[in-house]
């Protein structure tokens, strides 16, 4: 695998943490959101990495809690005229690309993703221009402009299958932006891949020494790892997969104790799936006992109850997602290819 670009030195400023709400304030905003969803003919689409109270609200109001692939499917098929996307900005943009006729609202448009930030379109276009004989495959965690340059968009849940398919056709591949997922896919498929060097700030923080110590403390535990994690962490895993695949693995593994190396937001749905099992967070702190993300995306944490209520009530430039039509049409092509390919996998 060749490595052509290294944005590792980028340090992304974290957003301020939302102000904690009292029990009464939470109850007030929950009821307000439920009322506004009905009034607006809106439905919530929430990612597994949002806070538990946000996922619970999506459940209670008939919304969706899922990985980014299922979020895209659900939003496109749901009859609601407005989608409230609780996640990060690329998820809102993806919803708009697939459902241009709908109003797409987000609690904040400032909810970024380090993978998206680490793949600026100008540099990525230059990278692709330098390798015109390669098929361009980009992860869903990218901007509309980067998707518009791609031949395929892919999520972690179908990444191995898609790259294996392209490799069987003899295609050379540009993969962006996650270097760890790219390395994992290359190892699984043997494909010829040029890999962009982005990383998720959460998964990149998992440490082998700390994980080994936790494993020694709980030798009966299985280790579940998202493939956005470093290779050394992936190699320690009993199960590797996307968020939905890790939840499925939690159910099928016989172990009663699970160490989970992904954003701790997943614990809400995973614990529902395995109520009798003990879930442990994989450590992100290094030898200095410090961490930046501490196993929770700071931008996902921006999706608070107050911000959701404000988005439904105020709309406007601070909350509504807009995508340039020219870019939307171009990005729709690789997104639809992904959805069509995923449909063939489901049979």
UniProtKB/Swiss-Prot annotation:
Keywords: 4Fe-4S, Cytoplasm, Iron, Iron-sulfur, Metal-binding, Pyridine nucleotide biosynthesis, Transferase. The keyword Iron-sulfur applies. Belongs to the quinolinate synthase family. Type 1 subfamily. It is an enzyme of class 2 (transferase). Its main location: cytoplasm. Its EC number is 2.5.1.72. GO terms for biological process: 'de novo' NAD biosynthetic process from L-aspartate. It comes from the Bacteria. Catalyzes the condensation of iminoaspartate with dihydroxyacetone phosphate to form quinolinate. [4Fe-4S] cluster binds at residues 113, 200, 297. The gene is nadA. Its cofactor is [4Fe-4S] cluster. It comes from Escherichia coli O17:K52:H18 (strain UMN026 / ExPEC). Binds 1 [4Fe-4S] cluster per subunit. It catalyses: iminosuccinate + dihydroxyacetone phosphate = quinolinate + phosphate + 2 H2O + H(+). Iminosuccinate binds at residues 47, 68, 139-141, 156, 226-228, 243. GO terms for cellular component: cytosol. Signal peptide: none annotated. One of its GO terms (molecular function) is quinolinate synthetase A activity. Pfam families: NadA. It is found in: Cytoplasm. This is Quinolinate synthase. Pathway: Cofactor biosynthesis; NAD(+) biosynthesis; quinolinate from iminoaspartate: step 1/1.
